[in-house]
């Protein structure tokens, strides 16, 4: 048996996900742009946004209809947007608990994703209480060096770029140019482009930034899997949970998702609960 490598659904080698914070009124236009190009993402909302919508902000009706019905995800961003790194653990626990509780009660959904409200996050104490609070992934505010790698530490998920990064479009070109037919690294490793930011950063005549990005990256369904953060997490988790026989001639998929991978230069799809010969 040669090396096995993950493929995104449909045997794609590339995936794109977006992550936007704070739930401001400018999310309206951002969602419209993303939808127009078939791009999906996760919107990280502080709990206070849904418990007491601000005057001049998104209304209760908009909060209910803007995200999930359009195929996007809502994730935890604390309750009051407190930075856990400069908070006592007990305050951090309360902040994340209340933030998750508020979102779940408002949307009537189980919400397990998160974005840290502040700075690069690698603190093990914080990660420990996030696990206890049922958070399965948390996006950090670091990275931004053009990496297309799938995270190993889901509670320190480093993005590819922020939407104000001057190299964002350069990274997009590199991502699109990676050809699995001619590039060994692109053929071996599935690629993930992760863009994050705040929709209010486009408000001063800068909407062209995200419009150009989405126009370039969208509409490539045969090549790119467009997914929310949680969809990425759940799919990779399902792939990593595959069970192989000792001689690598059989594989069992215990998850509820179909999983795609390549081995011996052949493509394999293993359905939910299915055992296949290789």
What are these regions (language model features)?
Residues 35-128, 132-136, 142-161, 191-199:
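Metal-dependent polysaccharide deacetylase catalytic core of the NodB/CE4 family, i.e.
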Residues 20-23, 78, 199, 229:
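Active-site metal-binding loops of divalent metal-dependent hydrolases
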Residues 89-94, 166-169, 204-207:
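Non-membrane alpha-helical structural segments and their capping/turn regions in soluble enzymes
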Residues 170-186:
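A short, acidic, amphipathic alpha-helical segment used as a generic capping/interface helix at domain edges
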Residues 1-28:
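Boundary/entry segment of secreted carbohydrate-active catalytic domains
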Residues 5, 29-33, 125-129, 209-213:
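A short acidic, amphipathic alpha-helical/loop segment
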Residues 17, 73, 224:
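Hydrophobic "anchor" residues on beta-strands that sit immediately upstream
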Residues 2-8, 51, 104, 137-148, ...:
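C-terminal domain-boundary segment and adjacent tail
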């Amino acid at each position: 048996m040669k090396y096995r490598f993950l493929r995104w659904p449909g045997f794609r080698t590339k995936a794109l996900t977006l992550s936007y914070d704070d739930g401001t009124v400018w999310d309206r236009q951002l969602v419209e742009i993303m939808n127009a190009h078939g791009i999906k993402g996760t919107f990280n909302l502080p709990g206070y946004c849904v418990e007491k919508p601000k005057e001049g902000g998104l209304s209760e009706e908009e909060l209910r209809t803007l995200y999930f019905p359009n195929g996007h995800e809502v994730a935890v961003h604390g309750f009051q947007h407190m930075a856990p790194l400069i908070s006592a653990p007990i305050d951090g626990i309360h902040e994340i608990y209340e933030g998750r509780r508020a979102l779940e009660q408002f949307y009537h959904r189980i919400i397990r994703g998160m974005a840290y409200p502040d700075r690069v996050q690698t603190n093990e104490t914080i990660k420990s209480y996030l696990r206890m609070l049922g958070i399965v992934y948390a996006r950090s505010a670091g990275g931004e060096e053009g990496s297309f790698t799938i995270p190993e530490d889901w509670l320190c998920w480093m993005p590819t770029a922020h939407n104000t990064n001057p190299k964002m479009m350069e990274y997009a070109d590199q991502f699109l140019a990676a050809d699995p037919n001619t590039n060994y690294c692109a053929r071996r490793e599935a690629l993930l482009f992760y863009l994050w930011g705040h929709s209010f950063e486009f408000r001063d005549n800068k909407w062209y930034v995200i419009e150009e990005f989405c126009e370039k990256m969208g509409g490539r369904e045969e090549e790119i899997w467009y997914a929310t953060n949680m969809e990425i997490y759940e799919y990779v988790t399902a792939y990593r949970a595959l069970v192989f026989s000792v001689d690598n001639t059989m594989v069992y998929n215990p998850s509820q998702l179909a999983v795609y991978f390549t081995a011996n230069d052949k493509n394999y799809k293993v359905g939910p609960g299915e055992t296949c010969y290789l």
